[in-house]
Amino acid sequence: MLYRYFLKVASIFTIMGLIFVPTSRQFVAAESYKELQEIDSYVLGQMKDLDIPGVAIGIVRGDQVVYTQGYGVADDAGRAMTSDTPFLIASLSKPITALGIMQLVEEGKINLDAPVQMYLPWFRVADEEVSSKITIRHLLHQTSGFDERESYVRNLSTDSSVEALEMSIRALNTAELNFAPGEAFEYTNTNYDILGLLIQTLSGQSYEQYIEEKIFDPLDMDQSYTSLEGARGGNMTRGYYPFFGITTAYDHLMPYSRIVKPSAGLFSSAEDLTHFLIAQLNQGQYQGNAILSEERIATLHTPGIQFSENAGYAMGWSVFSFPDMASVTPNNSIPIGLTHAGEWVGYTSLLVFIPELETGIVLLMNKHDPARMPEYFSIGWSLAMLAVGLEPLEPQSADFIGKNIRVLLAVVIVLLGIGAVWAVRKLRQLPSKSGSDSRQNQKLAIQMTLLAIVDLALAVGLLFIRLPESKDTIFLSLRFNPDIGLMYVLLLMFTLGWGTIRTLLFLRQSLKTNKLENAI
């Protein structure tokens, strides 16, 4: 969906080598009041700069929740945001699903290196031979070969039936893999939805029941939910989207379907997610309760594929070296940071933890803007910096086109509109031209040809460069980024639609003019 998750996080690390009022507070004496004021000031400043209605954060140190805080509002009525307010956490569902799978590994119910077909005998993709080679580990490491864009189409399903998850996985029998299992990395929800079905099949419970009983309950995640209805009952925040640059409540496109629950459909609060991070930082322990062994936690955190010497993907976690924190580690060593982000229309979320520094942060925001995601995610990493006594990062930005996509599209569409008016006027004059105006006719022919070239270049650039690079389609843009999608449609209407009509009219009028000249 939109900018791809890993590219957003990686961009941060490349650069690294209403008046909002705090509305809830909880902290222990591990932090000074001055440090907490700095955190509050930073978050409020970012909210103002990025026009974010509401934010909730949490900071963990060792086995303690150091600080939780809510800022701004949770809805248009001005309800105060708190650290207990539920959010749609989108892809933060993935590390939760990965934890569930690892619990089943510990119980001996599943083998990471076994093929999916061992547990789902009917499981198929288009290539039957390849079907038997996709393992559980491939799914966890996002190396199965499934296509990212196709998974976003599945996100739009509204099927909430008991059979929905299994039926969606059975429908993969026509899926073409982008590469052989284990050969490369491609982030896709499909992998984790299959894992969710495995949890459901091997546990004998629904995915939702398992997550609630085996993860939410032991971690005291009382404001975490596996259904939209439950989250709304817990007073979840509304989501906001910058519709043509105006922040607007826009959360109707929710994950109603059970199909995407394991990959992107869970709900939680900042307070609850600090409990989840404590278990990650403390070898699977939370308040004396072990939800997973130290060995299995280590497996979850170990990269299965490397993007570079300093970056890789583990099981539900991206793993990076964090050089900016070397000054606060023993022996000035460069610590490893683990992170995952979540995006949906109206919601942005981020988890970060640094095991060597025993520090973790939760960042939940009730706004999503595909043009500002690097800036959003850098807030989370800056909070991690502040939490260990360092200065926040310099503000991050998307690439020029990404950051200014709405303005650029609007300018192009206006220019195309002006060009359309000009072309209509010229075409109306063309039939009256006589032989003495042949030079003007030739000039107009050149102008029309140049317009056609510009139209073709814009259409090709959008359809074959911009959209494929962002793993997007016009249809998905209209659903997940409606204003940008609408401008894409207008651009294509002007270039391919009107451009074709204009060219045909010019050719017809030229023929009429030639006949008129011949008659004279």
Regions flagged by a language model, labelled:
Residues L2-E31:
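Hydrophobic secretory-pathway targeting helix
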Residues A29-S32, P86-L88, R124-E128, V153-D159, ...:
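Second-shell loop/turn segments in exported
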Residues G54, L88-L92, L104-S151, T174, ...:
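Active-site helix/loop module of the DD-peptidase/beta-lactamase fold
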Residues A231-P255, K261-P262, S318-F320, D324:
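Carbohydrate-binding/catalytic loop surfaces
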Residues A29-V55, I59-R61, E212, P255-I520:
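Catalytic loop of the DD-peptidase/beta-lactamase superfamily, centered on the K-T-G motif
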Residues S32-I89, V125, N173:
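Short, conserved catalytic-motif segment at the N-terminal edge
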Residues E38-I39, Y71, R79, M118, ...:
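Short, charged, amphipathic alpha-helices and their helix-cap/turn boundaries
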